[in-house]
């Protein structure tokens, strides 16, 4: 209880109802409250005034908050909640947020009719110290509204009177300014100074160039640590200040150099937000000193060229060459490349014999899309290093103000960041608030005062800082870096600055922000402001500043000359990616010995005797085991588990995430078993042997965009891991369309970034309506080109087994899109023999007619893909005049293989492509030209006819009856029935 009292501190007003209720309990029965409270209340009761137990009431200063007070909360929780005001208030002086009455009010005594008001000072020690505690706490909570954050001075700043932060609000006056304050308190810290000195200190700390929001943090230790750090002085030596100035000179100098040499060229200058580059560089140095070995940075286009050079270490000549020649990669690679301000880079930085690896992630213009990719890449690197404390590899994300509060992926990424499967030990966020979103003012882009409200979802500390005060920016950065490393959580530094030019250098901002840009035009740069400060303090003279600029320009002139003959380099396929090829040289043999498969399968079906698994699963596992040992055909789930188990036993780590993927949306996988008694779990795939690799499976939060982005990022770090994301239904994958369009399908040709990510998308038309039928197969086929990925619609367990193993055993890495089954998971014909998974077997992209037929008697050949095959197969029955061929892989289209099969049917009169999807969806529009080409190559003078659903705006009908009619119609039409 003593600790609770300490945390409750000076009995701030939010606890009034809580303390009053305790006091009433004490009056009724002193033994009903803790001993410490008994002693506390005894001090009140022992007063000479007689108390009437039915009417005595304690009045304590309070604050008005939005949430209702929960009187059952512990004092620790109360100390961290936003609390409601008490239901009553005995005295309220003025329209303020807190009562100025600081006394214990003893109501009228029934026996004497007298009343008495006892000064609180008499019962709580020195009154001024008590009031000072309240003042400190109030400054901490609300003084950010008074902070000088806007370098343009456009904001009308509030005053102390506006916020009731003058000393009179706390029952103090000027006569007490020289009175000594002596506070020893766990929450507000230790203070021993004059009241005037306290006020000065609080003003300097909380109403200067830094404003903080820490009250959303529930952990008292974290909050105290942050306030104490902020209240501590940070000093910079003369040499430190010169280094800072030099950094500012280089940031501004490079932007101006490009502006002069390439007028009008887009570069998305950082000018106005120069401090952000210096802060990022400082954060890296600080992180290195704290044991960080690698940092991955994600950011948008603004300030990227300066980040590439000043922060990450890309040669200036390499960036300048991009302006001169336009080439970013060697011509012989024959890739599309991307604009300069989207490209990433990697390098090593060494300071004081300490080395840190830096990576700037490639990104598109889609703002904030890179956030989960960076997080996933960091998690993968941490796993490679065995960095379970998440302290050796970290992420830095740089956001724009309008994007941070406008893009939904920010909230998705923040929400998932504390979850076990996605935790990377916190991210250092810099929000570069230049007070504009292209042409939109802040009032048009958000309803909140700050752009950082999303960060409160995870109770991240937020430090707002004036971008013109470089030393304040560095102090905030220092606190943020230390916090992330100490507590392993996200932290946000918002740098309020401005944008010197328009959205790009060719844009005219005066059309829409005339007032702002009139101020900006006459405003000294951050570098000039800081140089003037150093001149005034006698650290440098004007010649020193001029010389710094001249020397840096001379350096850039040399880099410019070298850039004229610079040949771009391709930084990829190094490190863990050595041995991986861009071009697939041969088909991998993916089969596994039959005995090995049976042994692995048996092991997968073993459940510990003391593990209380659901009885239905016991039967399921027994049936699987019997299937394997008796050499019966296996189903899809068993084949998938065998693929995983064989890879794990060969040393390949596997990571599978997605909504409900542990069990499987359709209750087929059951790779995580749950104890029915104590909720513990057992994962058979992690209990194969002592030498096996790791199987990580996690049910994700309800997100597609951020989760798929995270897994894509994870796949970039290590090609030797099998990384999978499974959609709950394929229909929901388009919630992550940006990841598919901007990253998965195009990252290799834009940025030379390869990925072996596997995407499982349940897809089939089964009468479940327009939202549970289609993974939009057509969209993936539209994205497919230049051997950028595999798009498959497999129909057999053998196919999924080989596809999964091929992702690792191939000598290249391409994303694999799988239209995965739903009803086929339990279809009696959707099975494979173990021999089809056995030694010297491989994935077959095309499956010929399964029955033995006389090709001379075949009058019709139907090509199809996916579940519709089984519908056709069952309806065809014993008709031996129709051959059905399956395409298990749609892209890349195996032209030669298909042509060789069709040659067998050169006497066939009719060729049909059959699909379940509407004509404007599915594979038809992609595949029709390919199919007719292979007919010609096979020497067959014919064309493929379409059979399927008619064109439709919606993927499927909502009625099961209507679905069944459509399905029967297309099947009969295809079969000629």
Curated annotation (Swiss-Prot):
This is 2-oxoglutarate dehydrogenase E1 component. Gene3D superfamilies: 3.40.50.12470, 3.40.50.970, Multifunctional 2-oxoglutarate metabolism enzyme, C-terminal domain, TPP helical domain. InterPro entries: 2-oxogl_dehyd_N, 2oxoglutarate_DH_E1, DH_E1, KGD_C_sf, ODO-1/KGD_C, RPE1, THDP-binding, Transketolase-like_Pyr-bd. E1 component of the 2-oxoglutarate dehydrogenase (OGDH) complex which catalyzes the decarboxylation of 2-oxoglutarate, the first step in the conversion of 2-oxoglutarate to succinyl-CoA and CO(2). It catalyses: N(6)-[(R)-lipoyl]-L-lysyl-[protein] + 2-oxoglutarate + H(+) = N(6)-[(R)-S(8)-succinyldihydrolipoyl]-L-lysyl-[protein] + CO2. PANTHER family: 2-OXOADIPATE DEHYDROGENASE COMPLEX COMPONENT E1, 2-OXOGLUTARATE DEHYDROGENASE. Belongs to the alpha-ketoglutarate dehydrogenase family. GO terms for cellular component: cytosol; oxoglutarate dehydrogenase complex. GO terms for biological process: glycolytic process; tricarboxylic acid cycle. Homodimer. Part of the 2-oxoglutarate dehydrogenase (OGDH) complex composed of E1 (2-oxoglutarate dehydrogenase), E2 (dihydrolipoamide succinyltransferase) and E3 (dihydrolipoamide dehydrogenase); the complex contains multiple copies of the three enzymatic components (E1, E2 and E3). Residues 77-125 form the RPE1 insert domain. GO terms for molecular function: oxoglutarate dehydrogenase (succinyl-transferring) activity; thiamine pyrophosphate binding. The keyword Metal-binding does not apply. It holds the Pfam family 2-oxogl_dehyd_N. Its cofactor is thiamine diphosphate. SUPFAM superfamilies: Thiamin diphosphate-binding fold (THDP-binding) (SSF52518). Its EC number is 1.2.4.2. Keywords: Glycolysis, Oxidoreductase, Thiamine pyrophosphate.
